[in-house]
UniProtKB/Swiss-Prot annotation:
InterPro entries noted in UniProt: ADP-Glc_PPase, ADP_Glu_pyroP_CS, GlgC_bac, GlmU/GlgC-like_hexapep, NTP_transferase_dom, Nucleotide-diphossugar_trans, Trimer_LpxA-like_sf
Highest taxon above the source species: Bacteria
Record-linked Pfam families: Hexapep_GlmU (PF24894), NTP_transferase (PF00483)
Molecular function GO labels: ATP binding; glucose-1-phosphate adenylyltransferase activity
Enzyme nomenclature, EC number: 2.7.7.27
PROSITE patterns listed in its UniProt record: ADP_GLC_PYROPHOSPH_1 (PS00808), ADP_GLC_PYROPHOSPH_2 (PS00809), ADP_GLC_PYROPHOSPH_3 (PS00810)
Function: Involved in the biosynthesis of ADP-glucose, a building block required for the elongation reactions to produce glycogen. Catalyzes the reaction between ATP and alpha-D-glucose 1-phosphate (G1P) to produce pyrophosphate and ADP-Glc.
HAMAP family noted in UniProt: GlgC
Entry keywords, A to Z: ATP-binding, Carbohydrate metabolism, Glycogen biosynthesis, Glycogen metabolism, Nucleotide-binding, Nucleotidyltransferase, Transferase
Name assigned to this protein: Glucose-1-phosphate adenylyltransferase
Amino acid sequence: MAKTRPKVLSIVLAGGEGKRLMPLTMDRAKPAVPFGGTYRLIDFVLSNLANSGLTQIAVLTQYKSHSLDRHISITWRMSTMLGSYVTPVPAQQRLGPRWYQGSADAIYQSLNLINDQSPDYVVVFGADNIYRMDVDAMLQYHIDSGLGCTVAGIRVPRKDASAFGIIDADQNHKITEFLEKPADPPGLPDASDESFASMGNYIFSREALVQALHDDAHSADSRHDMGGDVIPRFVNAADAQVYDFRDNEVPGNTEKDADYWRDVGTIDAYHDAHMDLVSVEPEFNLYNPDWPIWTMQEQAPGAKFVMRGSCDDTLVSAGCIISGTDIYRTVLGPRARIERWARVDESIVMNNVAIGSNATVHRAILDKNVIVPDGAQVGVDHDHDRARGFTVSPGGVTVVGKGITVPY
């Protein structure tokens, strides 16, 4: 007799404001921010779940969710014949007229989803990191343990670990302590110079999660955060383990991108992650046919290059027209148009951006529908960029918000 597959509900936490990504999140939720030319940030977690065979997915949304809801509804239309779905679930205010108070409160206020489906296990993942992961492998690891909670952890250099939520685990991967950005992070039993950083991805046994959420909801001193409040409950009960992301094998991954994971929650991190895409041997390979990142591709003709020019180490999306210009280490979104003698380098150019003749764009992010007139400059003089109202990150990346015509 065939083994019965357990019932699994996946919940994606997509309600973050993304304040550190402003102005890219001025009019959109953080998971709806474009990435890699044609994708949205949320496409990465949804692709990982779908490729892993986990196709009953609720996406909890909150702030500025229109473009995110629309993207999910149009792009992630799964066949319902076998019970598959990806559905956006806005804040329902079941406990009164208030927003979610934290990630744990978001799930607590959405317990009807869990109660209605009555899954054996609940997968809870974040919506705004860049990585590939076979979630089913982590699920099997959780099931085999018999524990209530499994937390995905990625190995990071111990010297850099203070920037993360850190997992202290014993040699059997049982979590002994969950630390929020500790000054002296603990090393690993098998690598003293490394620490486990939490990836913000969890798998729970249903009854254990529901009980923990009820306990947290009635705790007066809780911030109602999954990592800060709920996971420590499991740790204190000796009911949590860490899943080593290094052990996760994804079909088609190269040795270089096998354990790639990036938090793109700041402008500099977002820019750096894009630069990871454009190398000859990229840090993160979008061209893996065995584990595709799914999205709705722009209905546009192929990119066109005319009047010579050069384009090196650049990702070019459909519908772009590039006319005799020099482009280097750049990601071009759909239908971008760049005129003669312009220069664009180390930049992110989103949908429908127009860059005029003799313009210069250096280490910049141009949101959709931006116009850079003939001869204008972006990213060349940061003081001038700030004077024109543009954001300049600590790492020197200039950001021009959606729909702006760049003044001289």
